[in-house]
């Protein structure tokens, strides 16, 4: 799912329909989120998610902003793409 809050909604919808997400669940439904929401370990089943390194993302954003401010509008190349490693938090939902 796009984020953990959407994945939590998917867990609730699955439960309403009698589905049991997870490796041991019926029907082969596995649900995972993205952003390691603090409540993810406490859902039923516990939500699998990908944790983001928010400190690295924040540092990169501030560095880029400072670079832009010091460039007097002379930065070329347009937007930059920077990838960050995530950490899989494998739990019961997947």
Q: What residue spans do the PLM features occupy?
A:
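Flexible loop/turn connectors
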Residues: 1-94
């Amino acid at each position: 799912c796009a984020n953990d809050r959407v994945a939590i909604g998917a867990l609730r919808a699955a439960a309403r329909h009698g589905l049991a997400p997870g490796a041991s669940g019926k029907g082969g439904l596995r649900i995972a989120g993205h952003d390691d929401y603090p409540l993810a370990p406490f859902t039923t089943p516990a939500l699998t998610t990908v944790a983001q390194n928010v400190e690295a993302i924040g540092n990169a954003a501030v560095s880029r902003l400072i670079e832009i401010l010091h460039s007097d509008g002379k930065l070329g190349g347009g937007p930059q793409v920077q990838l960050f490693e995530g950490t899989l938090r494998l739990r019961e939902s997947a």
